[in-house]
Amino acid sequence: LNKDQFTINVSNRKIVQGLIDELKIPEEKQTKVIRAIDKLDKPGFGLKGVEDLLKKERKDQSGAITKGADLSDDQAQQILNFLKIKDLKQLKETLKNPLSQEGIKELEDVFEVLGYGSNLNQVKTNFTIVRGLAYYSDFIVETNLNFKVTNNKGKEVDIGSICSGGAYAKLISRFRGVDIPGTGISFGVD
């Protein structure tokens, strides 16, 4: 692949977790909130679809209803405002929660390191990348192709994400009873 054919989106789960904590969203609703945010870039969702999932429910094109997180209007609006932020400076000025600030600092450190060794213009911050799985704890990465391919029916399709992953501090403890931090990625094409 040429450098202009892919984008590496990076974020930090601590940023959104700090926002969730600041909004005092109960633990039993947090997974639904994360999964709603994770759907922002999925076909048929956008901000309206996320808003529906943050509130009462979302009805898709087939008529199927997905129960939402049942957040207050204010909580949902603050999350939607967060999703519109595009740069670290604005994010740093907006989110004051210590956990969010820690995640922002860690992202700044990533970009500082990248700046020393390369000119990776294809690495971008994308705060909506949260990965819907609860075991991610901080750094998150998602790599997307920037071009379409022709499928076996002759139709141009967007492949989207081909490599995703991140850091997880407590995943192994589910199986071994000991906290061992790790980082992992997976490759795949639908």
Regions found by a protein language model. Give the residues of each.
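Positively charged, Gly/Ser-enriched RNA/tRNA-binding surfaces
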Residues: 1-5, 14, 51-190
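Helix N-terminus capping/helix-initiation residues
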Residues: 12, 26, 44-46, 72, ...
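Short alpha-helical interface elements
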Residues: 20-21, 33, 41-45, 58-65, ...
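Generic detector of bulky aromatic hydrophobic side chains
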Residues: 9, 26, 40, 122-124, ...
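Acidic, His- and aromatic-enriched active-site or binding-groove loops in soluble protein domains
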Residues: 24-54, 145, 149
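Internal, well-ordered domain-core segments that constitute the primary functional module
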Residues: 1-25
